[in-house]
Regions:
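Non-catalytic propeptide/linker segments at domain boundaries
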Residues: 58-75
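Intrinsically disordered, low-complexity regulatory segments enriched in Ser/Thr/Pro
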Residues: 43-60
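Generic signature of intrinsically disordered, low-complexity segments enriched in small/polar residues
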Residues: 22-23, 27, 37, 49, ...
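Short Lys/Arg-enriched alpha/beta "domain-start" segment
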Residues: 1-41, 64, 68
Length: 75
């Protein structure tokens, strides 16, 4: 399972929310402003501007939005 974190602008945040709107899920964790779940990837956006992708499709989905600043794999 891969974990990837991007640092994104406010404009990209809006694009991400629109793109994954159909996959929206509610997350009540502190600092979370948006979350979505795909069959193979969880996506979490934070107030800090960080966007985290977790799961088998993390690399694929992160590549749509920007340069990876953190990457780690549990394998």
């Amino acid at each position: 399972m891969s974990n990837i974190v991007l640092s994104i602008s406010t404009n990209i945040q809006k694009e991400v929310m629109a793109y994954y709107a159909a996959n929206y899920i509610e997350r009540k964790a502190a600092g979370v402003i948006f979350a979505a779940k795909l069959p193979d990837t969880s996506i979490t956006m934070y107030k800090s501007g960080k966007l985290m992708f977790q799961g088998g499709g993390a690399e694929r989905e992160a590549a749509r939005w920007g340069t990876i600043i953190y990457y780690w794999s549990k394998g």
